[in-house]
Every structure is written in structure tokens, then in C-alpha cells.
Amino acid sequence: MVMSEIQGQRIAFIQATWHRNIVDRARDGFTDAIVELGYPKDTVDFFEVPGAFEIPLHARRLAKTGRYQAIVAAGLVVDGGIYRHDFVATAVIDGLMRVQLDTDVPVFSVVLTPHHFHEHAEHVDYFSTHFVKKGAEAARAVDATVKSLKALPTS
């Protein structure tokens, strides 16, 4: 992609602040990778929400502005011992899929739901590293999908 194809295109990155120390790492991985792919750093607008459950509504509102060519969502949904996490994770992923299908703006998920997570150093370190990787993967997926969609016939 040449720089003239990138100019003026925006990407929204929505991040839950629950477990911020870990979820911030997805933002870091995404930002580093998107810049490596040739996008100017200021192409990405960052938005924060309290938790993952709030992400789909924000994604929908941002998609409807027409300003964004892609939206990325990042969050960590953990099992707090009351089986709620499965319902939250499903609602978030289903909501994100609906946003992209309803608005025609691609939405990428770095909302992760580990089988086991505890607030101890080993898990925090593991998931922090994993979120960097997933953020970078999301950047590459954004780039590939945006290019692919632009190549499709419009009528």
C-alpha cells in the first residue's frame, strides 16, 4: 500500500479499562504493527469504555459516523466464579459481528476470554505478552481486510 492510499483513512480502537495493565498491551501491539505496515501513527483514534460489555454500542456509534474504515475492540473477560463471563463474552462477540454486518465497517476483536485467569504474576505476564501478539495480529488483519474490501466490486 502506498502512502497516498492510506492518507485520510481512520481506524478506531476501543479498549475496555477492566484489567487495563493487560489490555493496554493489545493497544501497544496494534499501534506498533499498524505503523510498521505504513499507516501514520495518528491514523488511530483511541476510545476507552469501562468493560467489554460496553464495546459493541461504542463500535456501532463509531461505525455509523462514516469516519472509520475499521474498528478494533480489545478487552479481557475473566471468570469471576459466577459463570457470567461466558454470557458477557458471547454478547460482546455477537454484538461486534452485528455491528460489522449492519454497518459494513469491519470490526476486529481482541476481546479474549481465558479458560483460567488469576491475578498472579505468572498469568498477568502470560496474558500481557499474549495481548501484544493479538494486537499485532489485529493490525495485520485490519490491513489485509481493508485492502481486500477495496478490491471488491462495488455494484
From Swiss-Prot:
Pfam families named in the record: DMRL_synthase
Keyword Metal-binding: no
Substrates-to-products reaction catalysed: (2S)-2-hydroxy-3-oxobutyl phosphate + 5-amino-6-(D-ribitylamino)uracil = 6,7-dimethyl-8-(1-D-ribityl)lumazine + phosphate + 2 H2O + H(+)
GO cellular component: cytosol; riboflavin synthase complex
EC number: 2.5.1.78
Native source organism of the sequence: Rhodococcus erythropolis
Family: Belongs to the DMRL synthase family.
Highest taxon listed in the record's lineage: Bacteria
Pathway assignment: Cofactor biosynthesis; riboflavin biosynthesis; riboflavin from 2-hydroxy-3-oxobutyl phosphate and 5-amino-6-(D-ribitylamino)uracil: step 1/2
Lineage: Bacteria, Bacillati, Actinomycetota, Actinomycetes, Mycobacteriales
Residue sites binding 5-amino-6-(D-ribitylamino)uracil per the record: 18, 52-54, 76-78, 109
NCBIfam families named among the record's database cross-references: lumazine-synth, PRK12419.1
Keywords, sorted A to Z: Riboflavin biosynthesis, Transferase
Transmembrane domains' residue ranges: none
Active-site annotation: 84
Single GO term (MF): 6,7-dimethyl-8-ribityllumazine synthase activity
InterPro entries given in the database record: LS, LS/RS, LS/RS_sf
Function field: Catalyzes the formation of 6,7-dimethyl-8-ribityllumazine by condensation of 5-amino-6-(D-ribitylamino)uracil with 3,4-dihydroxy-2-butanone 4-phosphate. This is the penultimate step in the biosynthesis of riboflavin.
Protein name in UniProt: 6,7-dimethyl-8-ribityllumazine synthase
CDD domains attached to this UniProt entry: Lumazine_synthase-II
